């Protein structure tokens, strides 16, 4: 039996392409995850492995859908082989089982390239964040209140205006107002 496994890293990505390819290949059952490959817990993959029986083949669209790094891929494929389950990657067109030396060689090569590609992506992302910080951008949501708002907020609070009223004025929660007040108090304490 051919058992498919599909994975996307974020909720913004879509499984349709992978599932279509797995169906075209003849997979009778498809398991999936919406989770980064860097996470060790992948319930869909775990269910696919539990479901697979000796003689079955687990099929993925691309090798990088299966694992975080070369060591994980090798461990996983060895586990499958020990259970008598083979593995096939559609894009790389490799089948891995104990009987195929060529399949083992290709698997190790493609696993190394998949890990290399992931590391490049991580390096680029890190470099991008560092460059953004150097330009004064720190990511995350923009602040709700600017410096002028904070000055007015502090004045209103010091004059006894209720937190609820202050929060309504800026259309934010009371928690947000308290967070800004704590931030202001911390700044004042640092300045002393």
Swiss-Prot record:
SMART domains in UniProt: Resolvase
Residue stretches making up the Resolvase/invertase-type recombinase catalytic domain: 1-136
Regions recorded as binding DNA: 163-182
Keyword vocabulary terms for this entry: DNA integration, DNA invertase, DNA recombination, DNA-binding, Plasmid, Transposable element
GO biological process, one term: DNA integration
A molecular function (GO) term: DNA strand exchange activity
Keyword hit for Lipid metabolism: no
Domain of life the protein comes from: Bacteria
Active-site residues annotated for this sequence: 9 (o-(5'-phospho-dna)-serine intermediate)
PANTHER family: DNA-INVERTASE FROM LAMBDOID PROPHAGE (PTHR30461), SERINE RECOMBINASE PINE-RELATED (PTHR30461:SF2)
Function: DNA-invertase, mediating the inversion of inv.
Family the UniProt entry places it in: Belongs to the site-specific recombinase resolvase family.
Protein name per the record: Transposon Tn552 DNA-invertase BinR
Gene for this chain: resR
